[in-house]
């Protein structure tokens, strides 16, 4: 697994052994960031990487010009790899790693975010809790922010209060759904 673009292009990333963490494939990440770049520049963006795992998505965003990344992950082995990857790429000053379950920290997130990258366990996409979680996340985003959800291509993406689906792309068994946060639909943040 490697960074596919930006200042750290081709740099290898650490990943925990085993099947518990499912890093986003390089070609899927390349496609995701190509589509993201066609919609909005990443330069200076504040990025939230939910269910961060190794941090591959958020670190890719930082490599491509984002100014700040918040990584939320609860698995101990993934956190070790994530922290090592942040350190190896020199992104300590631009990164905040939160060792907690996403559901527990969403209310306390310090936004606003321009881009949210969400790669939850695929089974969670079918649960109403994910839609509720992403609706809360939308409240911590700028209007017109982009939320990207990675999911099993067979599963329909959930509806998110405060955001509209703009499109879904399929990469083999992987689906990427892009949402745009709408100022008209956005729920208020709990400050």
Q: Where are each of the predicted segments found?
A:
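Class I S-adenosyl-L-methionine-dependent methyltransferase catalytic core
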Residues: 1-191
